[in-house]
Amino acid sequence: MVQDAFSKVVSQADARGEYLSDGQLDALINLVKEGNKRVDVVNRISSNASSIVRNAARSLFAEQPQLIAPGGNAYTSRRAAACVRDLEIILRYVTYAIFAGDASVLDDRALNGLRETYLALGTPGASVAVGIQKLKESSIAIANDPNGITRGDCSSLIAEVSGYFDRAAAAVA
């Protein structure tokens, strides 16, 4: 079940029959304080999604030209488009996780069973993982640009964003 950070904390406390701890409350208060930065990051990535995906795919195919060569897994424009579509879907679900402050939407809706699907299709998961890392590099560069974004330290949010991409890459590798 997909949960945001608030629902997850409440569900965990309820399952244990406990009140929310000071640490849990502090973490949720911090999440609220950081909300504008989170929205800014999601907006930046979403607004640049097509170029992020396009550049990640170009870079992946430049580094691994065997993928688009005859006999390669992304050979033919239809197969290459499917690869780009998959990168786009993963990026979209990463933005949902960033907004929610929780990876469950990414896990449940995008990553659960993806490795097995790629294995069944003969898709090289390691190549998909490289593509995801390229999405990460571009997304973080855009998110880290200090111009026109809520002021303040974004290092923990950027680390969180990085973690969602790493989680996605590990799920397919």
Curated annotation (Swiss-Prot):
Keywords, ordered alphabetically: Antenna complex, Bile pigment, Chromophore, Electron transport, Membrane, Methylation, Photosynthesis, Phycobilisome, Thylakoid, Transport
Main location: membrane
GO cellular component: phycobilisome; plasma membrane-derived thylakoid membrane
Binding-site positions, (2R,3E)-phycocyanobilin 1: 83
PTM annotation, UniProt: Contains two covalently linked bilin chromophores.
UniProt induction comment: Phycocyanin-3 is expressed in red light under conditions of sulfur deprivation.
GO biological process, one term: photosynthesis
N4-methylasparagine carried by residues: 73
Binding site for (2R,3E)-phycocyanobilin 2: 154
Domain of life where this protein originates: Bacteria
Membrane topology recorded in Swiss-Prot or TrEMBL: Peripheral membrane protein
Signal peptide: none
Localization (cell): Cellular thylakoid membrane
Matching Pfam families: Phycobilisome (PF00502)
UniProt keyword annotation of Cell division present: no
Role, per record: Light-harvesting photosynthetic bile pigment-protein from the phycobiliprotein complex (phycobilisome, PBS). Phycocyanin is the major phycobiliprotein in the PBS rod.
Family, as annotated: Belongs to the phycobiliprotein family.
UniProt subunit comment: Heterodimer of an alpha and a beta subunit, which further assembles into trimers and the trimers into hexamers.
Name this polypeptide is given: C-phycocyanin-3 beta subunit
Organism listed in the record: Microchaete diplosiphon
This protein's encoding gene: cpcB3
